[in-house]
Amino acid sequence: MTKIWVEVAYALPDKQYVIPVELTLGDTVEQAIIASNILTICNDIDLTKNKVGIYSRPAKLSDNVRDGDRVEIYRPLIADPKEMRRKRAEKARQKTE
């Protein structure tokens, strides 16, 4: 069996986790996440809700990983991006007046 190395990454506002994991060729994104033990380190991760990706590209838990991949677990947005842009623009307008 061919061994491969991947990284599992998860970022909180105050701490980032990047965990290297040795897997077997043909293993999935979900297997990489489980092997990293990130689910026990960060108990706020719910794989039924959190989206995942490989190098910033959306992925499914069933997708195969390749040697050198970085599996990323994404947190849900806490603010609407459109609303935040509107507030920044309004604040900038007030500064120029």
Curated annotation (Swiss-Prot):
Pfam families in alphabetical order: Ub-RnfH (PF03658)
The protein's name: Protein RnfH
HAMAP family per record: UPF0125_RnfH (MF_00460)
Organism in which the protein naturally occurs: Proteus mirabilis (strain HI4320)
Gene3D superfamilies: RnfH-like
Similarity field: Belongs to the UPF0125 (RnfH) family.
